[in-house]
């Protein structure tokens, strides 16, 4: 392993904002991870494990060690009824989805082009167009930072929720995802009830769904390689049936979907209807085609993004009485932070 000192983080996160890390190292094996996390030499140093850095914003320089997960490898087994994959945590997610489609393995096509690594998918319980990671998860393996051993959780033990999992709670800063196990029924059925997939026929092929999802994402979402961003910046808020009924009276065209504990309202619709598409502070801008995405127009600072996010949150609350929660992770000087904490520090 080679440790970089004073490393520029711009190439390591998709927002592409200039920030520095005191140390940065690329981990290519579980032994690398054990050496970094479990040895006395680096035990006291704050650490942040990242994959593609596709769902985070460094709010300032990071004083600890950034560990880049580059564990690679895909193992494929099958029986009469199922395909089973064991995927190393550093595998690129869009490439994994593409590989599955090429192999005729259905189940991930709705999750095409979501940036990031396989190891990040269970942490966020990534989802799109009616499918979430939990729907295809068999197990998740992780390095336990307390014991230095690799452990396995079943899908049920991962406690998946909307953009949520055990890795954000009981196992927060106690685990590094090393691999995921995925399970796909050979009797594949397309999930095409959402958005632009609705007009696909029920007998469509895996490739048809994949192509439609890719085309939609490329049309609506900016390529981080061209214009820095972290994808969907805010979560879709879940409100009670009563609150939704009141909202629907004033806004009959509100975009929403049933949720387990109420109604999930489209955050992009709320931001758009608040007149914020194209709204800009410094080099940070609400994307003109997809209001849920904040982009770096080229010279944005973290301060620009934070100020814009806070402004969006306040304006949406003023319009609808709904408080948006950011989906993007905010990384502070030595630990994870959030928008409320940042705003209180500015006061």
Swiss-Prot record:
Coiled coil region boundaries: none
Catalytic reactions on record: UDP-N-acetyl-alpha-D-muramate + NADP(+) = UDP-N-acetyl-3-O-(1-carboxyvinyl)-alpha-D-glucosamine + NADPH + H(+)
Pfam families linked to this entry: FAD_binding_4, MurB_C
Residues at the active site: 163, 232, 327
Predominant place of localization: cytoplasm
Mind listing the GO biological process terms from this record?
Answer: cell division; cell wall organization; peptidoglycan biosynthetic process; regulation of cell shape
Which cofactor(s) does the record list?
Answer: FAD
Note the InterPro entries from the entry. FAD-bd_PCMH, FAD-bd_PCMH-like_sf, FAD-bd_PCMH_sub1, FAD-bd_PCMH_sub2, MurB, MurB_C, MurB_C_sf, Oxid_FAD_bind_N
Q: Which residues form the FAD-binding PCMH-type domain?
A: 17-187
Catalytic activity, EC: 1.3.1.98
A GO MF annotation of the entry reads: UDP-N-acetylmuramate dehydrogenase activity
Q: How is this protein annotated for GO cellular component?
A: cytosol
- Annotated keywords: Cell cycle, Cell division, Cell shape, Cell wall biogenesis/degradation, Cytoplasm, FAD, Flavoprotein, NADP, Oxidoreductase, Peptidoglycan synthesis
Q: Which pathway does it take part in?
A: Cell wall biogenesis; peptidoglycan biosynthesis
The transmembrane segments are none
User: Where does this one sit in the cell?
Assistant: Cytoplasm
Q: What does this protein do?
A: Cell wall formation.
- Assigned protein family: Belongs to the MurB family.
Name of this chain's protein: UDP-N-acetylenolpyruvoylglucosamine reductase
Q: Organism, per UniProt?
A: Vibrio cholerae serotype O1 (strain ATCC 39541 / Classical Ogawa 395 / O395)
């Amino acid at each position: 392993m080679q440790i970089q000192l004073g490393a520029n983080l711009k190439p390591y996160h998709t927002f592409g904002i200039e920030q520095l890390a005191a140390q940065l190292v690329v981990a290519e094996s579980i032994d690398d991870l054990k050496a970094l996390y479990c040895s006395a030499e680096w035990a006291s140093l704050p650490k942040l494990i990242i994959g593609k850095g596709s769902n985070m914003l460094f709010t300032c320089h990071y004083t600890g060690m950034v560990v880049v997960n580059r564990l690679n490898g895909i193992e494929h087994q099958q029986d009469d009824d199922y395909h089973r994959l064991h995927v190393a945590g550093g595998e690129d997610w869009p490439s994994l989805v593409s590989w599955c489609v090429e192999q005729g393995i259905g189940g991930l096509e709705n999750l095409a082009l979501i940036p990031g690594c396989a190891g990040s998918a269970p942490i966020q319980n990534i989802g799109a167009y009616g499918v979430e990671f939990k729907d295809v998860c068999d197990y998740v393996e992780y390095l336990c930072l307390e014991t230095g051993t690799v452990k396995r959780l079943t899908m049920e033990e991962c406690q998946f929720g909307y953009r949520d999992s055990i890795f954000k709670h009981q196992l927060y800063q106690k685990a590094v995802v090393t691999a995921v196990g995925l399970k796909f029924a050979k009797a594949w059925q397309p999930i095409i009830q959402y958005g632009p997939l609705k007009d696909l026929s029920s007998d469509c092929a895996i490739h048809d769904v994949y192509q439609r999802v890719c085309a939609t994402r490329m049309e609506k979402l900016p390529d981080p390689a061209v214009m820095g961003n972290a994808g969907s910046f805010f979560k879709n808020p879940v409100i009670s049936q009563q609150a939704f009924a009141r909202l629907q009276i004033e806004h009959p065209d509100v975009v929403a979907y049933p949720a387990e504990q109420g109604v999930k309202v489209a955050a992009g619709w709320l931001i758009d209807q608040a007149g914020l598409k194209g709204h800009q502070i410094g080099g940070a801008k609400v994307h003109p085609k997809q209001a849920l995405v904040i982009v770096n127009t080229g010279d944005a600072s973290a301060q620009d993004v934070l100020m814009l996010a806070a402004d969006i949150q306040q304006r949406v609350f003023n319009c609808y009485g709904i408080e948006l929660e950011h989906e993007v992770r905010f990384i502070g000087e030595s630990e994870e932070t959030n928008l409320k904490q940042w705003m209180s520090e500015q006061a």
